Amino acid sequence: MNKNEKMVRSLMGTVVSNKMNDTVVVRVERRVKHPKYGKFIKRSTKIHAHDKGNECQIGDIVTIRECRPISKTKSWTLVKINERAEKVE
């Protein structure tokens, strides 16, 4: 890695909303250990990500990476769609 390159955070999650123009809401799940009981618990956070071209559908599994702030709530951008959601007819 050169001096000019920065480590960029990237996460994988599921698209839960695509109703906004050029924006998707991605739910990212993580597992944390309960401090007292030691059981692993699922915790999730919802992140707004920039989706140029409105490619994502609800249920898609996507990779997002951190970028400069695009708006008040958006500072992540879509890298790729790992898995498409199945169409239900």
Swiss-Prot record:
Coiled-coil stretches? none
Asked if the Swiss-Prot or TrEMBL record annotates the protein with the keyword rRNA-binding, the reply is: yes
**Gene Ontology molecular function:** rRNA binding; structural constituent of ribosome
Q: Which UniProt keywords apply?
A: Ribonucleoprotein, Ribosomal protein, RNA-binding, rRNA-binding
Tell me the Pfam families matching this sequence: Ribosomal_S17
Q: Name one GO biological process term.
A: translation
Q: Which Gene3D superfamilies match?
A: Nucleic acid-binding proteins
Entry GO terms, CC = cytosolic small ribosomal subunit
PROSITE patterns from the entry?
RIBOSOMAL_S17
Kindly indicate whether the keyword Ribosomal protein belongs to this entry: yes
Under the heading HAMAP family, the entry gives:
Ribosomal_uS17_B
NCBIfam families with a match to the protein in the record:
PRK05610.1, uS17_bact
Q: What does this protein do?
A: One of the primary rRNA binding proteins, it binds specifically to the 5'-end of 16S ribosomal RNA.
Query: Subunit structure, briefly?
Result: Part of the 30S ribosomal subunit.
Q: What family does the entry list?
A: Belongs to the universal ribosomal protein uS17 family.
Q: What is this protein called?
A: Small ribosomal subunit protein uS17
| Gene (UniProt) | rpsQ
